[in-house]
Structure formats: structure tokens, C-alpha cells
Amino acid sequence: MAEFHASRDPYATAPYGVSWAGEEKSANWFDSAREFTERWHHQQQIRLAVDKPGIMTRELYYPVLDCFLRALPFTYRKVSTKPGTYAHIIVSGECGDSWYLYRAEESWQLVEEPIGEKISETTIPQEIAWRIFTKGIDRESALSQTKVTGDTKLGQHVLGMISIVA
């Protein structure tokens, strides 16, 4: 499997788009990342079910999170707010990071650095982030473990994001 993904031109168009990110056409690198997230999260589900140590290492889990969070613009596409603002999404823990979702005039964009005025900040513990994005935890349980400041409704919207084909 690794040889197959390594053999593909990472920037060529993949046979299938990453639908949960709203793409009809995706680059091979994103399709390969999507495939990795599928395998990682199924392995993690099995480990959770049989009470075995997980595979939450920075090397393995951070790429999963980074791929999952590429669904943010698609997830927020119907959420309206003032242009020139951003939502800050934090996955806390050694495997986590910060993601910035910027509201441009017509759409949401994932950006590397904050732009404009912060309107919400959502902090999700790394232990449950993958479960939120793969429908592995109910909303109430997720809400009780996350922290949102600023625009609560906007900040909590990420808890409905699905980063798998469901």
C-alpha cells in the first residue's frame, strides 16, 4: 500500500475527491492522507474497544488531525459571520496544534496564521478530537470536555464536523 501511494504524483488529480472536505477533485497527496486517516482511526477504534494502548504519537496522530481539520471550510460553509474574522480551533496535547479558520467575503478559508479579529476559540482535548471527527462520541460528551470562548455557537459548530465518509 505504501508503495502505491509513494508511486503517485502527489499533485496530480486523484481518482476520487475527498468528499468530506467538499472537494469533487482532490490532489493525490490529499487522497493518500485521507486513506491514512481511515486506517489510523480504524486501528484506534479497535484499540479503544479492546482497552489496548492507542497510537496517539505526534508522528502518527498529528497528520491525522491536520487532514481531518481540512474539512473546516466545508463544515462552516453555511455559517455566516462578519468577513475579516476568524475562529481559532485548538487541539490540546502533545499531538495537537492550532488551526485558523478565516471568514473572507464569500467563504471560509483555512489559513496558517490568524488574520483579522478572533471571534471564537475552541479547545478540544486530543484524546477526543479524533472521536468527534469520526462520529465516535456524542455531542453532549464532547461539549462537556471542550472549552469555547467568544461566539459559542460558532465555536461549537466544529463539534459537528465529520472527516470521514459516513
Language model feature labels by segment:
Residues 1, 42, 146:
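Hydrophobic pocket/interface hotspot
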Residues 7, 114-166:
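C-terminal interaction segments
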Residues 21-77:
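Short, contiguous alpha-helical
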Residues 63-104:
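A glycine-rich beta-turn/hairpin centered on an aromatic-Pro dipeptide
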Residues 49-64, 82, 86, 141-153:
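Short alpha-helical "patches" and their helix-cap loops
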Residues 96-121, 125:
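Acidic/His-leaning functional-site neighborhoods
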Residues 33, 40, 81-83, 95, ...:
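A short, structural micro-pattern
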Residues 2-32:
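Acidic interhelical loop/turn segments
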